[in-house]
Swiss-Prot record:
EC number(s) per entry: 7.1.2.2
Subunit (UniProt): F-type ATPases have 2 components, CF(1) - the catalytic core - and CF(0) - the membrane proton channel. CF(1) has five subunits: alpha(3), beta(3), gamma(1), delta(1), epsilon(1). CF(0) has three main subunits: a(1), b(2) and c(9-12). The alpha and beta chains form an alternating ring which encloses part of the gamma chain. CF(1) is attached to CF(0) by a central stalk formed by the gamma and epsilon chains, while a peripheral stalk is formed by the delta and b chains.
Task performed by this protein: Produces ATP from ADP in the presence of a proton gradient across the membrane. The alpha chain is a regulatory subunit.
UniProt KW rRNA-binding keyword: no
Protein name: ATP synthase subunit alpha
Main location: membrane
Keyword Transport recorded: yes
GO MF entry, a single one: proton-transporting ATP synthase activity, rotational mechanism
PROSITE patterns, A to Z: ATPASE_ALPHA_BETA
Record family assignment: Belongs to the ATPase alpha/beta chains family.
Location in or out of the cell: Cell inner membrane
Gene3D superfamilies per the UniProt record, alphabetical: 2.40.30.20, ATP synthase alpha/beta chain, C-terminal domain, P-loop containing nucleotide triphosphate hydrolases
Residues under site feature: Required for activity: 373
Amino acid sequence: MRLNVNEISDIIRNRIKQLDIGCETRNEGTITSVADGVIYIHGLSNVMQGEMIALPYNKFAIALNLESSATGAIVMGSYENISEGMVVKCTGDILRVPVGPELLGRVVNALGVPIDNKGLINCSNYYPIESDAPGVIDRQSINEPIQTGYKSIDSMVPIGRGQRELIIGDRQTGKSALAIDTIINQSCSGVKCIYVAIGQKATTVVNVVKKLEEYHALDNTIVILASASESAILQYLAPYSGCAMGEYFRNNGQDALIVYDDLSKQAVAYRQLSLLLRRPPGREAYPGDIFYLHSRLLERSAKVRSEYIERCTQGKITGKTGSLTALPIIETQAGDVSAFIPTNVISITDGQIFLESQLFNAGVRPAINPGISVSRVGGSAQTKIMKVLSGGIRTALAQYRELAAFSQFSSELDNVTRKQLQHGQKVTELLKQKQYSCMSVACQAIILFAVSYGYLEDIELSKIGDFEAKLISYLTYHELELVKHINIYGSYDSNIENKLKNILEMFKLNKFS
């Protein structure tokens, strides 16, 4: 069969018409250098700060340095197979992590990938790790408490839902223990908890998970681990991932609590990344934007109005407020709260709980220094009964510390001074509390009532602990209805005052005489 020229040209035209050549625009670049997990890329245009960059071998990097001639990015995970000359491309999206109730009870890494050998997590929602904090109009004043279960904190340094309360102190002073007990105390309160472990040993976090499971708090908690053995980029990202998970609950009209343990290690990880990216170092070799690192994270914790919730859920949830409470932890060196990172975070947060190593070593647990520990929300975050009964505690302790220091230089003391010293010693003894022994509002209230109304005056200092234990046992078994009422409503009136007086008088007469 022979074809003429016209037939050949017709066949070619038909083939050309049938061709479907797709047109695809890609934002690609070439790796020019690889060192210590940092890659520099030439040719990327319109790349965003924090954007995910797709690498060969199904790996990703995050763009952190946007320079005129190149883009500096940090590889997430191993960079062994990444080499110069490889082609990379922008994804057009920043890092997102899975969020939702499916994560409760699980241990995940900084990217939301499960690491507890309990199978995959099927989440239908993903949030970006970086998001804008709620504006001033969207926020609501804080008027509900987060009960820590510690007498000293709930009475002197109350924490409200939506507050940012810093826990600061030297190493081994009980900072993590305080935060873990607060999480355990939320197991029946409906507050969802997120515990972010940054730069800690994996074995330490395993013990924390076991304790949460033992006290039935794990099912209400998400644990995020970026251990000391993991890369600096994951330790830097972990708090933002945890915050995104907490924001999901807040934006759906629920209350959430997040613990950052601790932000000192995140600052160190960010310093490593910044120095690798050749950013100019400042004070203590930290980069110039180290304040912004923590401020943009902690400002996302807030109590928001019902209109904000309605807007976030597109009208699905109405008439509900939500909150995200943050407990950042900062480690100090030799009690120096005036160092760079501590002063930064103190200025961002709504108060601080300062734990002192001298008090800790003296057996005062929790080792709270009431002089410089403060809550800027104050009594508005307390129930009425706690607000009324806790008023004289801080004053009594302040007077006791002043007199105790003065009495060291005086050989003879008058009766009034001696009584004040004895009262201060008893209050200090009464505020001591062991780990994993959280107290309900009712139990705290009757103890504070006993202090305020002088029921401890005739009790020896050595018997204060025994008095407290027996009083709580008596109250729980004989006045269950009153306990339930105080725990639910937190109200205080002359009727409750008379009931508490009768309980204490009967207890001292029959059970502790």
